[in-house]
């Protein structure tokens, strides 16, 4: 069992019952721009938010295929089912996983995680899960990143599927390079 999608508020359900509008019309463009603006405010980000017509899994795949290639190495820090899933998605690129497994139900220890990353400078990417949906553990992403060197550090990709909109998540401020999330959990949308 995993939580989600969430129950939608009546106002969202009512809005979804309205007639569709064309994706090439001005009204759609205005709504889309407003959604991008509001997501940027939610994330406190000046970096453009890219909206994908996919699930959270599709967003994670997008991160993996755009930052990893066959022969690359990446660090996967996992404390549950969805951390493992992000790892498997990344491995499909042909990249090699260097794994740090945390006991399921426990969060990432800041010092151990930072030390592990520093021990593997050959790794191009670091995969982290902000909120591990399978256990409800929130990982200290901000604190981990703050202790990594600013230069010569891996690209940091974060699974925020069940955290964004529910708990604080400020990727630009924290130093996250890529964040994947979906609308059906903390954003309370279809």
What are these regions (language model features)?
Residues 13-25, 44-51, 74-78, 132, ...:
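Short, charge-rich amphipathic segments
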Residues 15-62, 85-91:
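Conserved N-terminal alpha-helix of the aminotransferase class I/II PLP-enzyme fold
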């Amino acid at each position: 069992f995993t939580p989600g999608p969430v129950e939608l508020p009546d106002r969202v359900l009512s809005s979804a019952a309205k007639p569709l509008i064309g994706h090439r019309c001005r009204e759609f463009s205005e709504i889309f721009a407003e959604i991008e603006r509001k997501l940027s405010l939610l994330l406190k980000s000046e970096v453009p938010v890219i909206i994908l017509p996919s699930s959270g899994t599709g967003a994670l795949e997008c991160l993996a295929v755009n930052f990893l290639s066959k022969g690359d190495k990446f660090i996967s820090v996992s404390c549950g089912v969805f951390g493992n899933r992000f790892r498997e998605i990344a491995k499909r690129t042909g990249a090699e996983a260097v794994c740090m497994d945390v006991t399921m139900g426990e969060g990432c220890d800041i010092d151990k995680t930072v030390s592990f990353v520093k021990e593997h400078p050959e790794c191009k990417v670091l995969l982290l899960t902000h909120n591990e949906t399978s256990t409800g553990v929130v990982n200290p992403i901000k604190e981990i990143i703050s202790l990594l060197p600013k230069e010569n550090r891996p690209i940091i990709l974060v699974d925020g599927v069940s955290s964004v909109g529910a708990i604080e998540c400020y990727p630009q401020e924290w130093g996250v390079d890529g964040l994947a999330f979906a609308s059906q959990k903390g954003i309370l949308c279809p």
